[in-house]
Amino acid sequence: MQAYFDQLDRVRYEGSKSSNPLAFRHYNPDELVLGKRMEEHLRFAACYWHTFCWNGADMFGVGAFNRPWQQPGEALALAKRKADVAFEFFHKLHVPFYCFHDVDVSPEGASLKEYINNFAQMVDVLAGKQEESGVKLLWGTANCFTNPRYGAGAATNPDPEVFSWAATQVVTAMEATHKLGGENYVLWGGREGYETLLNTDLRQEREQLGRFMQMVVEHKHKIGFQGTLLIEPKPQEPTKHQYDYDAATVYGFLKQFGLEKEIKLNIEANHATLAGHSFHHEIATAIALGLFGSVDANRGDAQLGWDTDQFPNSVEENALVMYEILKAGGFTTGGLNFDAKVRRQSTDKYDLFYGHIGAMDTMALALKIAARMIEDGELDKRIAQRYSGWNSELGQQILKGQMSLADLAKYAQEHHLSPVHQSGRQEQLENLVNHYLFDK
């Protein structure tokens, strides 16, 4: 079959002096960073949905893209053509991984039977493509939010029959992910929330969602899936309020239902923006809570109240994110999935490459800067100094539960404590970060 991207062989690393827009300037897969290949640090993935499923439509306009697999025709044949183009793209872009929702890769059909049969056929197609190309599945998931049946949610739906349909999709998608060697399975509660409290039983919906997640964990162990289960937090959109609001909220939910050892987090930059947090904050929080799993790398727009899903282009922001990830030991089963789409006006098919190339270069440069911060160790040293008092006898007695509140009150009076505030030196530390970013 003729190549879709027929004007491009492969995207290659040409160095920072290159002016070729279809070449990497900073992402060199084989470059060693802290003793590990850059490709192994970053574990890039391209997503199926924004890249090959979105037709350019928005709330104010119809589809703007002319993709051959989005034209009228036999659904399975079009899905197979889409897979041809997707794996051509993955190969030419040099991404080692990809991600999908079930209905991204397979026609949903008019019944559960059709859904299952179509998906089974496409899983065989994807398995062949993976073997042919060497591209692997970072994670799979089920789309339990687009179909009108999920208007009131999937796991939190007031109708147990809808709950059961969603369970069927998750079983099918997880087993497909397992068969394809996927390293993670993601759960994003697109409509697991509410529009108004006037028709919502919060306790009931929370119990339903908790039981659904428990069943997901049970099924994972039943089929022998060794990958990581991931929840992707988001505060709102499409619902007014979603139950997986942010990393800290999800932690409380997992603790309530005894799932904190079973499920980790897939953190998306744009979702952090919508929650009123920085991307850095959500990554650091997930790590501090022991829940860090994977990343959807993109960016939002602080002036807009919706999920713009733009490609990441801020080295400053992502250097701090990569610094946290490196300090935590790096990715295990997770990676950097580009949950991002070209703009509606970007109608040339090669715009898909420009978006991903810029994002990959951004993350590569961020990685190298983060590595310099790790090697220098100055930020860690400053934090250690700031909290050094907790290594004293008093600090350790407090942390080990050897002092009560009354004991501390007595200690403070007997020792005539009069502590003096020590400067946090925020401005100096911000200057230090700029040194790593901009001084060669």
Swiss-Prot record:
Keyword vocabulary terms for this entry: Carbohydrate metabolism, Cytoplasm, Isomerase, Magnesium, Metal-binding, Xylose metabolism
One cellular component term from this protein's GO annotations in UniProt: cytoplasm
Cofactor note: Binds 2 magnesium ions per subunit.
SUBUNIT field: Homotetramer.
This protein's name: Xylose isomerase
Cross-referenced InterPro entries: Xyl_isomerase-like_sf, Xylose_isom_bac, Xylose_isomerase
Gene responsible for this protein: xylA
Residues given in the record as Mg(2+) 2 binding sites: E268, H271, D307, D309
Binding site residues for Mg(2+) 1: E232, E268, D296, D339
Superkingdom per UniProt: Bacteria
Protein localization: Cytoplasm
GO molecular function, one term: xylose isomerase activity
GO biological process: D-xylose catabolic process
Cofactor(s) needed: Mg(2+)
Family, as annotated: Belongs to the xylose isomerase family.
Lineage of source species: Bacteria, Pseudomonadati, Pseudomonadota, Gammaproteobacteria, Enterobacterales
Species this protein is from: Escherichia coli (strain K12)
Recorded catalytic activity of this chain's protein: alpha-D-xylose = alpha-D-xylulofuranose
Active-site residues, record numbering mapped to chain: H101, D104
Keyword Cytoplasm: yes
EC number(s) stated in the UniProt entry for this protein: 5.3.1.5
